[in-house]
Amino acid sequence: MLFSEQYPGLEKKFGMVWRFAPMADPLVAEWHCRDLDSRPTQRELAAVQDWQQSQKTFHIMRDNKYHGASIVGCCFGMKIEITRNFPQMKKMFEAMLDYVKLKWFKGLDQNALHAVVWPEAQKDMVAHDSYLCHHFASDFNRPWPTQRISGPDFSAPEVLNFVGSNGGKITLANHGECPKQCRPKNHPDWLLC
């Protein structure tokens, strides 16, 4: 049976939850959810590789002071191992489809992630968080493995200098310093962590 045949009417569901379909696909071992307009960066690659080396199932990235959701729809990933957690992931996807039934509004995907995935993710995750590590305090929080690219005056020469960026940039002027508790212990000097 084709995957799409298992979920008739999926095309009528809130479109932003379609991107979570790999949770219920037995052929997927690992996946990363991004917005189409969010270009990958070296910073993101370093964070993903850090997570891949861990034994944690979920990867959450909050790389902007406005990434205030427990799980930002454009910045997370999962390891799905058939023998360990595929049935659980499939049930989560189906619960998210049920959650969005008859609803359609901006942010609904993140509400569904918070209601369905967050209770499990916070037990088994790596979370790279540059500004809100104190808000989502967890033993699984980690500072970003690389410093945010910035010029000598802390301006941002690169437009896409945060994960999930669709063209914006983070500078000291528009975001301020990242909190000290979100910086690597060996790099308290990273003002734009």
Predicted segments — roles?
Residues 11, 38-72:
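Conserved donor-nucleotide/metal-binding helix-loop-beta segment in metal-dependent transferases, i.e.
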Residues 16, 20, 45, 106-111:
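Conserved glycosyltransferase catalytic-site signature
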